[in-house]
């Protein structure tokens, strides 16, 4: 099943390229990492078709990106005490603070796009620096999803 992502036109072409590459590196993994995932995510220009919306916005000091989950009709779903959703969601908003992102290396800007998309697909934080799901502030050096990140996707989606 195809899932779609949408990019708000407030992003520069540079950030649009970061987002597109981040998505591609989650989807096209067999040749590069030897792990095949069942996910298919394609870009759409029709926001109503999208389940992953990339938005530009201002976040709290030091926060690079934030993913929020919604039910149809716009109801925001809150995370429980364990940081998990207690209900299924219909779509996710991935908000990126480009002014804060501009203070980190370019490769980590793209990695942050991939990190937030990982959340939108259901992954939580890891403290392993080689995982895309490690926060930049916790020492992330990954530039794309690792084999273990992809195996976690396979666990969720197969």
Give names to the regions the model predicted.
Residues 1, 5-6, 26, 115, ...:
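Broad hydrophobic/π-residue packing in well-ordered secondary structure
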Residues 1-20:
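Fold-level signature of zinc-dependent metallopeptidase catalytic domains
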Residues 3-5, 52, 94, 131:
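A broad, low-specificity signal marking well-ordered, structured residues that form hydrophobic/aromatic
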Residues 7-9, 56, 98, 135:
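Pocket-edge structural micro-motifs
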Residues 16-114, 120:
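Metzincin-family zinc-dependent endopeptidase catalytic domain
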Residues 81-108, 124-158:
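Metalloprotease/metallohydrolase-associated module, dominated by Zn2+-dependent proteases
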């Amino acid at each position: 099943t195809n899932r779609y992502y949408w990019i708000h036109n407030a992003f520069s072409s540079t950030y649009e390229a970061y987002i597109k590459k981040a998505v591609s590196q989650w989807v096209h993994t067999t040749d590069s990492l030897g792990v095949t995932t069942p996910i298919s995510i394609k870009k759409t220009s029709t926001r109503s078709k999208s389940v992953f919306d990339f938005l530009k916005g201002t976040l709290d000091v030091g926060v690079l990106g934030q993913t929020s989950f919604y039910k149809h009709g716009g109801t925001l779903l809150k995370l429980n005490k364990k940081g998990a959703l207690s209900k299924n969601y219909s779509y996710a908003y991935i908000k990126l603070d480009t002014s804060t992102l501009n203070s980190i290396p370019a490769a980590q800007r793209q990695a942050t796009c991939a990190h937030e998309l990982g959340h939108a697909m259901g992954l939580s934080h890891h403290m392993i620096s080689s995982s895309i799901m490690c926060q930049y502030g916790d020492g992330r050096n990954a530039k794309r999803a690792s084999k273990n990140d992809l195996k976690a996707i396979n666990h969720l989606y197969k």
